[in-house]
Each structure stands twice: as structure tokens, then as C-alpha cells.
Amino acid sequence: MSDIGIGIIGGGYMGKAHSVAFASVASVFDTELRPRLVTICASTPESAEIYRKAYGFEKATSNWCEMVADSDVQAIVIASPQATHHDIALAALAAGKPVLCEKPLGLSLEQSRSMVAAAKTAGITNMVGFNYIRTPASQQVRKFLAEGRIGEVTWFRGEMTEDFFADPESGGWRAQGAANGTMGDLAPHMINAAHAFMG
């Protein structure tokens, strides 16, 4: 059995979700390759250390460049604010490391295309973190569509009922101009679902 050293950039909601998921692989899947939580990267050394202890990582850092350069880290998960995705992904791909990047890839179509091109040029595996399309309900819809049980889909409507901005004082990174707000955070899920269901 071999392991793969995981580095996660971002300790917030999705950083925690990925950390818990990787830590659970051995108890859920029978696989020869086991993820090992090597490094968590957060915006400050203090928060990185808190996440390291909470999620079970070996190391903590606030410098993503340091983490990408670490030979113990063999794959990178980008779960940081959207404005950081592009530079981190390009550096990780240049270092020869597979990347799982939360959506959206970049802040623009140009950034996203350059990230995809860099992965293709390097011949490195990369993936966007579209989790909703992997839910059992979504998989069942896809199965029904493939079997012709629903018929031809001619129209799609998506609705996301999230409460991120219910408190006008909250906002967080979604309220920052460079983050593309709720559209940048949630619309990719709807676009991905439409593509998966309708082709």
C-alpha cells in the first residue's frame, strides 16, 4: 500500500470538508493509494496551526508557495478564496502536482482557460470541485436521463437556496469585489448541473 501526500490551501468550510473526506478514505474505500494529510495552508500562521491540530495535518503554513514546493506534498487542493486560485494552480501544475480546485477555476474565462491549458501542457491530472452533481439525487437524475425514463430535456431551471447574505454584516470573502460574489460562488454549480443533465 502506498500513500499520497495531500496539501490543502484554505481551512474554511471547503478546506474542512476536503480534510475530513481525505482522512476518511481508508475507512470508506478499499484502495491501494491512501491520502496522507501533510500540510494545511491558511492566511495566518496562527489559523494554520489551529486547522492543523483540528484536521490532523502533519504541518501548517501560511505560505502557499512553501507548501507547493514541499516534496512531501504530492497533490494540491485549492479551497481558498477565488481570487487566489489562478496563481496557486499554475504554480502547483508547474511543480508537477495534480490539482483539485474549488470552483470557479479563475476570476475570468481567460484565467480558467490558462489553468486548463497549463494542466494539459504538463500532462497533469486536474479537477474542479463540483460536488452537487455527485450527490445521490443528481446521479439518479442522470441515470433516469440515460435510460430515457424522463424523456428529452428541453428546459432547465436551477435554484440555489443558500443563506450566505441573510445577515448583511456577514459577507466574508464573498462580499469582496475580487471574489465574484454569489454568482461566482453558486452559479458554477447550476451551469455544471445543466451541462451534466442536458449535455
Positions of predicted regions on the chain:
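Glycine-rich, N-terminal phosphate-binding loop of Rossmann-like dinucleotide-binding domains
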Residues: 79-80, 160
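Beta-strand-loop-alpha-helix segment that lines the small-molecule cofactor/substrate pocket
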Residues: 75, 81-133, 148
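Catalytic nucleophile loop
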Residues: 15, 85, 190
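N-terminal Rossmann-like dinucleotide-binding module
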Residues: 1-55
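Conserved SAM-binding strand-loop segment of SAM-dependent methyltransferases
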Residues: 58-63
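Local beta-strand N-terminus motif with an aromatic residue
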Residues: 37, 57, 73-76, 150-153
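Predominantly a Rossmann-like dinucleotide-binding segment in NAD(P)-dependent oxidoreductases
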Residues: 132-199
